[in-house]
Curated annotation (Swiss-Prot):
Activity regulation information from UniProt: Allosterically activated by GTP, when glutamine is the substrate; GTP has no effect on the reaction when ammonia is the substrate. The allosteric effector GTP functions by stabilizing the protein conformation that binds the tetrahedral intermediate(s) formed during glutamine hydrolysis. Inhibited by the product CTP, via allosteric rather than competitive inhibition.
Residues noted as binding Mg(2+) in the record, renumbered to the chain: D71, E139
Binding site for L-glutamine: G351, L379, G380, M381, Q382, E402, R469
Gene name of the record: pyrG
DNA damage as UniProt keyword: no
Binding sites annotated in the UniProt record for CTP: S13, D146, I147, E148, K186, T187, K188, P189, T190, Q191, K222
The protein's name: CTP synthase
Subunit structure: Homotetramer.
Enzyme category, top tier: ligase
Miscellaneous comment text of the record: CTPSs have evolved a hybrid strategy for distinguishing between UTP and CTP. The overlapping regions of the product feedback inhibitory and substrate sites recognize a common feature in both compounds, the triphosphate moiety. To differentiate isosteric substrate and product pyrimidine rings, an additional pocket far from the expected kinase/ligase catalytic site, specifically recognizes the cytosine and ribose portions of the product inhibitor.
EC number of this enzyme: 6.3.4.2
Length: 545
């Protein structure tokens, strides 16, 4: 019988509900419980797939092909449960489901309202995602007091009544600001946030108080008094040097024990040695490398959240401090790739649209000609193919039909059909809705023997997650290969190019998929680990010159 932990946030947004939820989930998992996490987002978009990264940050793709909130990336990095389309629901998706039911006549001509129809659908989706787990942690997006969140808060209020206090508890995350000029922490915002929550019928069982410094026992007692929460259940969560320390910080204050008791769970003692090992390894850094991230959303780090974390994981497992230097591709387009002279490796991430493409191509040309380690992801692979076609094969003006439909040499184009991981055929065309034209989720990839890709992965077949519309045009593959491009990875049916590399380069790899989505701090991802290791070697060779 699944137990539920509902997590809300107050005072301000971006406090780290996702990290806190994932950290608690990691501790409960370390106690032998089967844990899943569900994110409820209050925006009206059906999913974040068509939202600007500047608005939303990265879109995290699950193995079953759902385009979801970036918090699901945190969830997968902290727990061993693989997230699915059942782990993220938006207001848009909830309303879409209800409207479809209304159109079918499921409500027998009744008036469809927020209560009970929308709230019932929210509860149904929560239970669907929680099925077969011991504990389901449900994070409510937004901040208490926002009008958009009200249906979700009402739904979880009802669930607490229906399930009882031993099957559902509330955790509220708040901010306790520190005023440097007076040297005081201020508890009033937390008091008001809880008051707002209680006004809609929700009494928190636990408070997690985000602060710059650890809260004193006096502050915790004061917060407990004014919020009607037990003093032991007021948890201080100060800023940490690494997010991977947070499970230990929460465990040290017995948060997991409080949760286990309140939910009457049978669980062994937590073994956090795995997380302690990650933190200890992160502290050992024998070298610093500078990796250039050449993209178009560089003003917002969250746009590349999983890549940032994957590079951090690689650094942990190679004793390397990875310093990511963000370069706006348009700046390289204007001022040239010499901006990259001090860099140890170059990474071109995914993206959509024409803006910045020529700058990415210049960066790739620099990496190829100057033998700088290079990793291209999704659009990064596509621009690597364009660069090679133009500057090595000699196909002047070669391009993707995404950027120039009239190009004489369409080395990349919209592929109308491909085979899914389960062997079924998938199709798309130019008239399909944007949300339906993507090749999404886990796909098989066969790696060619004797290639760098095969050496990096150490096996002949892999599954990686995709999110793209365009593919390498097979018409030009023979010409590309003839001039030295190696096709090191192909799709399950051998029809699509998935990975490329160069024979006359120390470390040049590009992939059509997104390896960052399957990296975690415990193991790292082999592609990122070897990329960072190549950056170390390049750094050492530069020092010798």
């Amino acid at each position: 019988m699944t137990k539920y932990i509902f997590i809300t946030g107050g005072v301000v947004s971006s406090l780290g509900k996702g990290i806190a939820a994932a950290s608690l989930a990691a501790i409960l998992e370390a106690r032998g419980l089967r844990v899943t996490l569900i994110k409820l987002d209050p925006y009206i978009n059906v999913d974040p797939g068509t939202m600007s990264p500047f608005q939303h940050g990265e879109v995290f793709v699950t193995n079953d092909g759902a385009e979801t909130d970036l918090d699901l990336g945190h969830y997968e990095r902290f727990v061993k449960t693989t997230m699915t389309k059942r782990n993220n629901f938006t207001s848009g998706k909830i309303y879409e489901n209800v409207i479809k039911k209304e159109r079918r006549g499921d409500y027998l001509g009744g008036t469809v309202q927020v209560i009970p129809h929308i709230t019932n659908e929210i509860k149904r989706c929560i239970k669907l995602g929680a099925d077969a787990f011991d504990v389901a942690m449900v994070e409510i997006g937004g901040t208490v007091g926002d009008i958009e969140s009200l249906p979700f808060l009402e739904a979880i209020r009802q669930m607490r009544i229906e399930l009882g206090s031993q099957r559902a508890i509330f955790i509220h995350l708040t901010l306790v600001p520190y005023i440097a000029t007076s040297g005081e922490t201020k508890t009033k915002p937390t008091q008001h946030s809880v008051k707002e929550l209680r006004s809609i019928g929700i009494q928190p069982d636990v408070l997690i108080c985000r602060s710059e410094k650890p809260l004193s026992m006096a502050d915790r007692a004061k917060i407990a008094l004014f919020t009607n929460v037990e003093k032991e259940a007021v948890i201080s969560l100060e800023d940490a040097n690494s997010i991977y320390q947070i499970p230990m910080i929460l465990h040290a204050q017995h948060l997991d024990e409080i949760v286990v008791k309140k939910l009457s769970l049978e669980a062994k003692q937590a073994d956090l040695s795995e997380w302690q090992r990650v933190v200890d390894m992160q502290a050992v850094q024998t070298m610093t490398v500078k990796i250039a991230m050449v993209g178009k959303y560089t003003e917002l780090n969250d746009a590349y959240k999983s890549i940032n974390e994957a590079l951090l994981h690689a650094g942990i497992h190679t004793e390397t401090k990875v310093e990511i230097i963000y370069f706006d591709a348009e700046m390289i387009e204007k001022h040239g790739a010499l901006l990259l002279e001090s860099i140890d490796a170059i990474l071109v991430p995914g993206g959509f649209g024409e803006r910045g493409v020529e700058g990415k191509i210049k960066a790739i040309q620099y990496a190829r000609e100057h033998k700088v380690p290079f990793l291209g992801i999704c659009l990064g692979m596509q621009t690597a193919v364009i660069e090679f076609a133009r500057n090595v094969v000699g196909l002047t003006g070669a391009n993707s039909t995404e950027f120039n439909k009239e190009t004489l040499y369409p080395v990349l184009g919209l592929i109308s059909e491909w085979m899914d991981a389960d062997g079924s055929k998938q199709t798309r065309d130019e008239s399909t809705d944007l949300g339906g034209t993507m090749r999404l989720g886990g796909q098989y990839c066969h790696l060619a023997e004797g290639t760098l890709a095969r050496k990096v992965y150490g096996k002949s077949q892999i599954i990686e997650r995709h999110r793209h519309r365009y593919e390498v045009n097979n018409k030009y593959v023979d010409s590309l290969v003839k001039h030295g491009l190696i096709i090191s990875g192909r799709s399950a049916d051998n029809s699509l190019v998935e990975m490329i590399e160069l024979a006359d380069h120390p470390w040049f790899l590009a992939c059509q998929f997104h390896p960052e989505f399957t990296s975690n701090p415990r193991d790292s991802h082999p592609l990122f680990k070897e990329f960072v290791f190549a950056a170390r070697i390049h750094h050492q060779e530069k020092d010798k010159k």
